[in-house]
Amino acid sequence: MSNSVAIVTGASQGIGRATAIRLARDFSALVLVARNRASLEETAAAVTAADAKALVIDADLGQPEAAQAVVDRALAAFGRIDALLNIAGAVPQIDLFEMTDAQWEGGLALKLHGARRLTIAAWPALKAAKGAVVLMSGNSALFPKAPYAAVGTINAAIVALAKAFSDRGITDGVQVNSVLPGPVMTGRRRSYLQHWAPLHNMSVEEATANFPKEAGIARYGEPEEIAELMAFLVSPGARWMTGSTLRMDGGEVKSI
């Protein structure tokens, strides 16, 4: 898509980085947002190698003023916003009875409120461009569990938020969908396995090998696989898809 601009949050690593690199094939410019500038610069190098422009913005989207600042800089640099992919948001994986109010608020601030504020700030530009928004949730939205209750709770809220935005988007010409990945092998997944392993009397290597069996899947997903789904949702081929919740988890969720 010539002269088209996408904002990708969480672009410094994992699914966010993979999505930004994938979108460099479809968009003329990418706005890359995360807190770690050095890692963002690495993503930017891959984006520019694919012949797309890259604007690096190191920002903490958990801060209320960050969203409007990101949108202002994107519009100043490129003049338009055609797609917004809200991927940022690490939620603490702590037991329901051990997680503090501050930890709950921290998880909500970035993943839920950060995505909400950025979508609202970008909405006028998205409306003008008849653009698309994707909010990344997770399949734990469908089966919250006590050992990591905040993850499932906040992911479920993301799904509801995307539905609300899509309702307004029908009138405004903005499509909004959410994506629910399952166990994808990222740095965050490796950290989770380091926590999960001793709880199940395993080494990290054993836990890494055994987790797919425990989850009822054949293997872990790859960030690039989720990136392909994200790219489809902001492509012309998905223009009539809005208000949808797309799960990509290797079959972990068995329910209808």
Say what each PLM segment does:
Residues 124, 167-168, 239:
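Alpha-helical segment proximal to the catalytic Tyr-Lys
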